[in-house]
Every structure is written in C-alpha cells, then in structure tokens.
Regions:
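Short Pro-Gly-centered flexible turn/kink motifs
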Residues: 146-162
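Terminal connector regions
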Residues: 28-30, 161-179
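Generic surface-pattern signal
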Residues: 113-116, 122-127, 176-177
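Extracellular adhesion/glycan-binding regions together with long Ser/Thr-
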Residues: 2-4, 121-150
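Residue-level detector of intrinsically disordered, flexible termini
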Residues: 80-84, 126-128, 167, 177
C-alpha cells in the first residue's frame, strides 16, 4: 500500500510518501518513508517522528522497553543514554515487538509515560532518553534529514516486528540480515 500527501509549512512545500509492505504470512511490516521537496528553495531541518502514545501489546499495557542496536543479528541494549539506538525492544514476558530503522539518521526516543505524543516523545532528546523502563508508556523514533534541494528527496526504511517472545529474536535476526 502506498500513501502520498502534500504539505506546506511556512513557504516550504513537500510531498510525503509512505509505502507499507507485508506478506500474508509475515510477522513484520516494512515501511519506506520518503520526503520530496516540491518547492523552489531548500528544505532544511526536516524531521520525522514515528511511534505510539500507548505501548499496549498482547494482553498487557505495562511493558518493558529497551533501547539498543542489532549486533551480530541480535538485539543488544545500548550502554549509555548518549549512544545512538536504532532498535527498541518492547516485551511483556509473552509477546515482543521490535521497532527499528536501518537509517544512520534514526534515533529511538521517548520511553515516557502514556500520554500526548508531542510531550512524551517529540520533546524528549534521544541523548537523554531512558535506556530501560517498565511502564504504561509511549515511544518513538526520530529522524532529522539532510537538507533537501528542490526536486530532490530523502528516504529511510523502518520495521515493525510483532511475535511471541520465543520466536521474536530469531525473526529480528532474519529481518536484519535481509535488510
């Protein structure tokens, strides 16, 4: 499925395209996001936040969220808040969700309490966001694009994996090696 929208902020005109890819048997979705500058001047400081204000998965609304990266095909929690995290693991003992990007511009952030996405995720610096927390909360991913010249575009890919805890890490490794 492809969704395309056009927006104007101030004097900047841009087009956003989101492509969803999922097979009938997969337990993950691939999202491709693209921003195209359809205006006449450079698009600067373009940012995207993706995430949720409520981390409910399976039958639980209080989940453990950990920021990390994929190391040798497996999730590895980051050692400090200042370390870039491109993967979020959300688990409740039975179910697991992985939310991640392959983009070097992506940063997992948020991990706040349940509530307004703008205040709980968008206003949270990835460099100071908690690394590991258990709560009824929100989370997100932040990307700041390079400046985009008129007629040019920038894009990135992100993944949402949902499975049982027993099979989630193997699925993450398979998706990561295919990415």
């Amino acid at each position: 499925m492809i969704v395309i929208g056009r927006a104007t902020i101030g004097t900047k005109i841009f087009e956003v395209t989101r492509t969803y890819n999922q097979t009938s048997t997969s337990k993950y979705t691939i999202f491709n996001e693209s921003i195209k500058n359809v205006g006449t001047t450079s698009l600067t400081n373009a940012r995207v936040w993706i995430g949720t204000q409520d981390d409910w998965i399976g039958q639980n609304d209080s989940n453990t969220k950990k920021r990390g990266n994929i190391v040798n095909g497996a999730f590895s929690q980051i050692p400090s808040a200042a370390t870039q995290a491109k993967v979020l693991e959300v688990t409740n003992g039975t179910d697991t969700v992985y939310f991640y990007t392959t983009s070097n511009l992506g940063y997992i952030t948020g991990l706040q309490r349940y509530g307004d996405f703008r205040t709980q995720v968008m206003n949270q610096s990835p460099a100071t966001a908690q690394i590991n927390v258990t709560n009824d909360g929100s989370y997100g991913m932040y990307l700041r694009f390079q400046d985009i010249a008129p007629g040019a575009s920038e894009s990135f890919t992100w993944y949402y994996i949902a499975s049982t805890k027993a099979s989630a890490e193997a699925l993450l490794g398979n998706v990561a090696s295919a990415a």
